[in-house]
Amino acid sequence: MAVEHVEWARVAWVDTDAGGRIHFTAAFRWAEMAEVGLRRKLGLIEGWGDYPRRRVEAEFLKVLRFEDEIEVRIRPERLGETSITWTFEITRDDEVCVRGALVVVRVDVDGVPAPLTKKERAALAG
């Protein structure tokens, strides 16, 4: 899939642990920030629906610290019937520091998995 999106951020104090390194949860917040940015860019914010996380994973390759400037790149890797697998990379100075994936499942108001919409599928497939 050719669709991807990039967001830029700076590691905030709140993103760090007592040792001054990023807390592991920060990577998932930044990935979600990029996910929302991509949805916004593709016109998929209105009527977005509910997408709980089914699986999250991250590999931390380099240390990120307070005030580091980062780039967060996300792309849909796989579109299932009811799910999207996002892959993301977080870089500093063109060096990959974190890479990971999120599997999200579209659910209806009762929390039951629901098919992706045709609009979503077309936009995310590129």
PLM regions: where:
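Hot-dog-fold acyl-thioester-processing enzymes
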Residues: 1-55, 108-126
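HotDog/MaoC-like acyl-thioester-processing domains
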Residues: 3-7, 60, 64-66, 77-126
